């Protein structure tokens, strides 16, 4: 929702993982784990161990993280905390959609139908989150617990210069002020399109906040947030019905802000569809709850701990796990030996 509707007006920069070498990337953990749950499947169902516990998230997190480090990227995963109260409606809608999809999954007769609805019912519960944190600890990969929205924490770390960019599929990172957003960082490669079934090549994309503002003809992040509010955000999911992307952009360009629209004929319609005053919605993006309580250290992986967790407890192949650990050790050594590989992007 929101900025995603402006996709046709925004031109991201297509790149590859090698171009991100030497960069610290704060990855939206919930976003990445949900991708793993919905794409790493067998016969339309997530991977499971012999006790029926889901392992797709562990599979994706292990091998994708190793791949990123091998490309010279320093990932740090950021986990969501308590969502703001205004997000409850969005979360309730998601819950209802999952219940509807669950009923369709029960009636599914083909593999394609099972895969489709299995993706829609995937849930990231507390046990899966704790699994992921335990795995990252054993891998020596840092993670951060956000007090509220994970993307807000990622953006804060990027603004502070502790990481170079946010890694997420969602455009909200830009609303939270991340100077750079890297999309598709955890799903690079050939993938089956979730709706058409077509095999497509997925490549990383970089979106710079300054470039997005320039392409949209906006002067500030505050204007970008007001634009998103008109289109709909997680805190006002319906936006303002009847005001599409182009009309919303025209209004913000012409009047400068939602506040300046209060004396126009269109304001009663806008006000009717906002759950609270615009300033309260703005503050969720411009002044989100974040923390400085984090340390970014990439440590030596605990090979035997990983074997105990993944092989003995979760039925992974010992040979594959040990090979992954060896790859991770070698990649981390290369990072320490080579240091930060500056690119021209560092100067912009």
From Swiss-Prot:
UniProt keyword Metal-binding, yes or no: yes
Region named I-domain: 113-256
Ranges where the record places region Interaction with PCNA: 340-348
Residues that bind Mg(2+) 2: 170, 172, 234
InterPro entries according to UniProt: 5-3_exonuclease_C_sf, Flap_endonuc, Flap_endonuc_arc, HhH2, PIN-like_dom_sf, XPG-I_dom, XPG/Rad2, XPG_CS
Cited function: Structure-specific nuclease with 5'-flap endonuclease and 5'-3' exonuclease activities involved in DNA replication and repair. During DNA replication, cleaves the 5'-overhanging flap structure that is generated by displacement synthesis when DNA polymerase encounters the 5'-end of a downstream Okazaki fragment. Binds the unpaired 3'-DNA end and kinks the DNA to facilitate 5' cleavage specificity. Cleaves one nucleotide into the double-stranded DNA from the junction in flap DNA, leaving a nick for ligation. Also involved in the base excision repair (BER) pathway.
SMART domains: HhH2, XPGI, XPGN
Name of the coding gene: fen
Superkingdom in the source lineage: Archaea
Biological processes annotated in GO: DNA repair; DNA replication, removal of RNA primer
Cofactor binding note from Swiss-Prot or TrEMBL: Binds 2 magnesium ions per subunit. They probably participate in the reaction catalyzed by the enzyme. May bind an additional third magnesium ion after substrate binding.
Organism for this UniProt entry: Methanopyrus kandleri (strain AV19 / DSM 6324 / JCM 9639 / NBRC 100938)
Class of the enzyme per the UniProt entry, highest EC level: hydrolase
EC number in record: 3.1.-.-
Full protein name: Flap endonuclease 1
């Amino acid at each position: 929702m929101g900025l995603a509707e402006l996709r046709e007006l925004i031109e991201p920069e297509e790149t590859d993982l090698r171009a991100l070498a030497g960069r610290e990337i704060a990855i939206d953990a919930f976003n990445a784990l949900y991708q793993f749950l919905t794409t790493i499947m067998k016969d339309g169902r997530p991977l499971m161990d012999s006790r029926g516990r889901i392992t797709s998230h562990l599979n994706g997190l292990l091998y994708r993280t190793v791949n990123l480090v091998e490309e010279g990227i320093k990932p740090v995963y950021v986990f969501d905390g308590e969502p703001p109260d205004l997000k409850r409606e969005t979360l309730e809608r998601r819950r209802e959609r999952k219940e509807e999809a669950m009923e369709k999954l029960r009636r599914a007769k083909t593999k394609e139908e099972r895969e489709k609805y299995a993706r829609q019912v995937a849930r990231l519960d507390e046990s899966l989150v704790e699994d992921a944190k335990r795995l990252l600890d054993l891998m020596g990969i840092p993670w951060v617990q956000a007090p509220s929205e994970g993307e807000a924490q990622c953006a804060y770390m990027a603004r502070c210069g502790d990481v170079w960019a946010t890694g997420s599929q969602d455009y909200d990172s830009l609303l939270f002020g991340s100077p750079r957003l890297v999309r598709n960082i955890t799903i690079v490669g050939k993938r089956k399109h979730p709706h058409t079934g077509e095999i497509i090549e997925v490549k990383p994309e970089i979106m710079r906040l300054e470039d997005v503002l320039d392409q949209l003809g906006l002067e500030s992040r505050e204007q970008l947030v007001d634009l998103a509010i008109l289109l709909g955000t997680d805190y006002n999911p319906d936006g303002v019905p009847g005001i599409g992307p182009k009309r919303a952009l025209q209004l913000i360009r012409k009047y400068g802000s939602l506040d300046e629209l209060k004396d126009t004929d269109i304001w009663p319609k806008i006000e009717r569809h906002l759950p609270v005053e615009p300033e309260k919605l703005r503050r969720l993006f411009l002044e989100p709850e974040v923390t400085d309580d984090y340390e970014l250290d990439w440590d030596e992986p605990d090979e035997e701990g990983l074997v105990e967790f993944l092989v003995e407890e979760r039925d992974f192949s010992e040979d594959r796990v040990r090979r992954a650990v060896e790859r991770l050790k070698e990649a981390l050594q290369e990072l320490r030996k080579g240091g930060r590989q500056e690119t021209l992007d560092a100067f912009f």
